[in-house]
Amino acid sequence: MTKDLLVELGLEELPAYVVTPSEKQLVQRMADFLKDNRLSYDAIEGFSTPRRLAVRVLGLADQQTDLTEDFKGPSKKIALDADGQFSKAAQGFVRGKGLTVDDIEFREVKGEEYVYVTKHEAGKQAKGVLAAVPEVLASLTFPVSMHWANNSFDYIRPVHSLIVLLDDEPLELDFLDIHSGRISRGHRFLGEETSITSADSYEADLRSQFVIASAKERQEMIIAQIRAIEAEQKVQVDIDEDLLNEVLNLVEYPTAFMGSFDPKYLEIPEEVLVTSMKNHQRYFVVRDQAGKLMPNFISVRNGNAKHLQNVIKGNEKVLVARLEDGEFFWREDQKLFIEDLVAKLAHVTFHEKIGSLAEHMDRTKVIAAFLADQAGLSEAEKSAVARAAQIYKFDLLTGMVGEFDELQGIMGEKYALLAGEAAAVATAIREHYLPDSAEGELPETKVGAVLALADKLDTLLSFFSVGLIPSGSNDPYALRRATQGIVRILEHFGWSIPMDKLIDSLYELSFESLTYQHKAEVLDFICARVDKMMGSAIPKDIREAVLASSSFVVPELLARAEALAAASQLDTYKPAVESLSRVFNLAKKAVDAVLIDASLFENDYERALAQAVDSLVLSGSAKEQLAQVFALSPVIDDFFDHTMVMTEDEAIRCNRLALLAELVKKVETIAAFDRLNTK
C-alpha cells in the first residue's frame, strides 16, 4: 500500500534568487533521505513561492523494505581456538552485529575460510521513519542565513508554519519552535490561512487563496499573459530568461500589465532605458514590430487584476523617477572632458594594497603595447590600443555610471564617440570588460581583445603580488572569472602567445608602482582555468598530460587535448603511448651535459631512431603533429627490442639516454606522454 507525502515549510519572504535553488535542494535532500531509509516511491516533485518551500512524494511505500546484509569477519583460524571453540575475536565480532555465535557460518574466499554472518532487519513503518523529516529541513544550506527570536539555529528566513501530511493525515512533528499542522498561508493580501485537506489537494487549496504553488505554472502564466499583451497591442516583448526567473519568484499570483512613459526619454541611450527597466525595476522591455524600443514596459503584479490602473500608475511614477535621473546624467556628463576625468583617476583606489586606478591603467598600457606586438596587430590597431589604454576607465567618474554601475564601459564607448575618439578606441573601451561571465560575450575586435587581456592580466598579477590569492570557493575579486576570460580570448582569436614566457616578460617589466610576485602560483592558476575549459569530456589523464607539456600556448593546449582524446579511441593509441612513456621514463636518467655521438651507435636500430629524431619537425594541426609522433612507435619499439639502454658501458649508456632525451624534448611540446593512462 502506498500514500502521498506532502511537506511544506512556510517562511518569511525569501530573496528571489534563492527560491528555485532551495526548491531543487529540498527535493534532492528528500529523495536522498528516502533512499537512505529504504522507502520506495513513484515520483517526487517540488513547489516554491516567495513564502514557502514544499515537496510532494507520490506513491510512498508505507513500510521500509526489509534489509538483509552479509558481514565478513575474521578468518576461521582466528575465529576458532585450539579446542575448536569460538574465540573472543569471533564472539566480539558477532556481538557487534547484534547476533550470536549460533549465526556464524564459514565461507571460502580465495582459498581461505572466513566467518560470515547474515543480519535480517525488518522494515519499519513509514510514519516512524518520517519523524526525521525535520532533519531534512535542517540540512538545507543557503548563501545567506539569519537567526531570530531565541533560536540559536540559523536559517534563510524565520519559519512560520510546517505541514507534514501522509495522504490526509497530519504527522505531529516539530521544527525549531514550530509544531506541524495542516494550516498554510494564502496570498499576503488577497488570501487567508487555509487548511490543506490532503497531499493531493495542495495546489487546489492554495489556488483558492490566490497562491500558485508551482513555479513552472507561474512561469507559464506570466509568458501567456505577456504573449496576450503582445498580440493585443501589436508589440514585441523581450522575455529575458534571467528576469523571468527572478520575477516568477517575486510573486505568488502573477498578473502582467503594460505601462508607458513619456516618449521624450527615448532620446536617452537605449542601454540606460533597458537598465532602468530591467535591472532596477524588474520590467520587461517593449519594442515595435521592427525591433525599435517603445515608450512602454511590461511588469508583473503579485495579485489579481483588481485596481490594476492604480498599480500601473504607481509603476509608471517609479520608473519616471529613474528615467529623470538618467536624462539628467546623460545631459550633464556630456559637459565633462575625458582628460579631466582620467586625471582624477589618480585619486580613485583600485585596491588599498595595490594602488590607484591610474596606476593600474599605466601598467595596463604597457602590457597592452607588448601584447599588441605579440598578437601581430597592425600599426593602426596598435595606435588604437595605446589611446584606449590611456583613457579606458574614465567613465567610472561620470554621473551615469555612478548611478548605473552596470553601464561601465557601455557609457564609456558612447561618451568617447561624442568626444570625437576613433570608433576602434570607443569600442575597445566597451569590450575591455568582456567576457563578463563564464559563457559571456567575447570582444569582437582585436583592439578590444588586447585591451581586455591587458586589463585582466594586470588585475590577476596585481592581486597575486600582494597575496590576495583565491582559495577554495572564496574569490572576492573575481580573479577566476578574469582568468577564464584571458583563456577564452586567447582561444577565440587563436593567438599563439606562450603564457609562461608572457608572464616572464611581464615580471621583467618591474613596474615602479608594483612588483609582481607569486609567478608559479599565477601559472598554476591559469592552468586550472585551461583545465576547466577543456571540460570533463576530455579524460583527466589527457588534460594533465597536455598541461604538463613544455608548450603553454592556450589555443594549442586545447587543440592537443581534443586530438589526444580522439586518438585514445583508436587501436594504435595504447601501443604508441606505452612506447613513448618508456622513452620518457628512461630519459629522466639522462645526463644534461651529454651530447649525442653517432660514432657510439652499435646497431642499425639506434641509427634508425637517431635519424627519425633528427628529422622530426612537428608541423600542421594538433592532430597531424600527434600522427607524426605516433608514427615513431615502430622505430621506438625496434630500438628497445634490440638495444640495451642501461648497458654497463657508461659512454654508450649516456649516449642512448641522450638520444631518448632529445626525443622527449621534441615530443613533450605536445604532452607529457608518461602521464597518460593506457590501462
UniProtKB/Swiss-Prot annotation:
The keyword ATP-binding applies. Its EC number is 6.1.1.14. InterPro entries: Gly-tRNA-synth_bsu, Gly-tRNA-synth_heterodimer. One of its GO terms (cellular component) is cytosol. It is found in: Cytoplasm. One of its GO terms (biological process) is glycyl-tRNA aminoacylation. SUPFAM superfamilies: HD-domain/PDEase-like (SSF109604). Its main location: cytoplasm. It is an enzyme of class 6 (ligase). It comes from the Bacteria. Keywords: Aminoacyl-tRNA synthetase, ATP-binding, Cytoplasm, Ligase, Nucleotide-binding, Protein biosynthesis. One of its GO terms (molecular function) is glycine-tRNA ligase activity. The keyword Oxidoreductase does not apply. Pfam families: tRNA_synt_2f (PF02092). Belongs to the class-II aminoacyl-tRNA synthetase family. This is Glycine--tRNA ligase beta subunit. It comes from Streptococcus equi subsp. zooepidemicus (strain H70). The gene is glyS.
